[in-house]
């Protein structure tokens, strides 16, 4: 990430809080439109902070992979069980596996349909949101800043005489593990190229090339993270250490705007989608409304979409 990015100027503790909130919000009923909007915002932040589109395209490629995988899993159609109602027969492979297959007539065929696609799309959007939030946190914060943020986050544990510094070092190393592995892969590939080993897109089919790349990467990553952990423990980020070379960032207007805009966006999407869930036509409700089933003031006319919003919004079962 570019050092001049505005995300580098935001307090690391605030970014850690925002990452945790994103993890929770990803599994709340944001709705399909809400997840699309959040992903667009996160991908835009990735492009702005990186000043290139490559990182956003990598995240999108992973989202497409999970979309393809979930479409395959959710596309199986079940033989109808005449002993059950029509609604109970509208289930997918996940429900079939969880129930042990006892409540359904069995798997009949695979079909690409709107309901399976929407269910898979929601899961892929949630995964993409988590990837984007983690990418923004790890690339905009140094390992020192992450360790300091984690220690401040778990500061209350000191009341129970629990040492927070080892926990903060461990979590900081875990947060920076993927960027470390990425940099080590690039370094090892360049070193191996001088010895005549050229890696291309088909190299993963060659077991010998895989071993010559990933074994050195694994050993180098373990050694580097161990060295980093020792360095943090010896000097690093301890606020009481007079020999420290780093200082925590101070809160400023940018921090406040970043937190306020993020919380406001999450709140608006949650309220809008839950408003839609409450005001849909349900025979069990004693209230009647003139405008039911609207998302952002637009009515749902498709029965498949309506069923999806009402019953399978969480899309984790």
From Swiss-Prot:
InterPro entries from the UniProt entry: ABC/ECF_trnsptr_transmembrane
CDD domains: EcfT (cd16914)
Signal peptide residue numbers: none
Topological category with respect to the lipid bilayer: Multi-pass membrane protein
Localization per record: Cell membrane
Keyword terms of this UniProt record: Cell membrane, Membrane, Transmembrane, Transmembrane helix
Cellular component GO terms held in the UniProt record: plasma membrane
Protein name from the UniProt record: Uncharacterized protein MG302
Annotated Pfam families: CbiQ (PF02361)
Transmembrane segments annotated in the record for this chain: 18-38, 58-78, 92-112, 130-150, 159-179, 202-222, 252-272
Family note: Belongs to the CbiQ family.
Chief site of localization: membrane
């Amino acid at each position: 990430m570019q050092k001049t990015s505005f995300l580098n100027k935001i307090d690391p503790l605030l970014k850690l809080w925002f990452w945790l909130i994103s993890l929770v919000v990803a599994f709340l009923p944001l709705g399909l439109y809400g997840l699309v909007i959040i992903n667009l915002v996160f991908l835009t932040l990735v492009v702005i902070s990186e000043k290139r589109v490559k990182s956003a395209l990598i995240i999108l490629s992973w989202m497409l992979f999970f979309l393809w995988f979930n479409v395959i899993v959710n596309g199986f159609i079940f033989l109808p069980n005449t002993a059950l109602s029509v609604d109970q027969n509208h289930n997918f492979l996940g429900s079939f596996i969880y129930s042990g297959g006892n409540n359904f007539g069995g798997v009949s065929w695979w079909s690409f349909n709107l309901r399976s696609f929407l269910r898979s799309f929601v899961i892929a959007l949630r995964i993409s949101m988590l990837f984007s939030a983690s990418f923004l946190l790890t690339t905009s914060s140094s390992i020192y800043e992450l360790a300091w943020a984690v220690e401040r986050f778990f500061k209350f544990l000191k009341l129970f005489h629990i040492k927070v510094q080892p926990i903060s070092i461990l979590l900081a190393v875990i947060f920076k593990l993927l960027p470390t592995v990425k940099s080590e892969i690039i370094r090892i590939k360049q070193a191996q190229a001088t010895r005549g080993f050229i890696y291309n897109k088909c190299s993963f089919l060659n077991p010998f090339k895989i071993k010559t790349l990933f074994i050195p990467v694994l050993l180098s990553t373990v050694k580097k993270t161990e060295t980093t952990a020792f360095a943090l423990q010896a000097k690093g980020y301890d606020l009481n250490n007079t020999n420290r070379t780093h200082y925590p960032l101070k809160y400023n207007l940018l921090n406040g705007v970043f937190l306020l805009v993020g919380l406001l966006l999450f709140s608006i999407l949650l309220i809008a989608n839950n408003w839609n869930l409450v005001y849909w036509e349900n025979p069990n409700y004693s209230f009647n409304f003139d405008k039911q089933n609207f998302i952002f003031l637009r009515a749902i006319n498709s029965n498949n979409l309506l069923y999806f919003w009402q019953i399978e919004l969480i899309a984790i079962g």
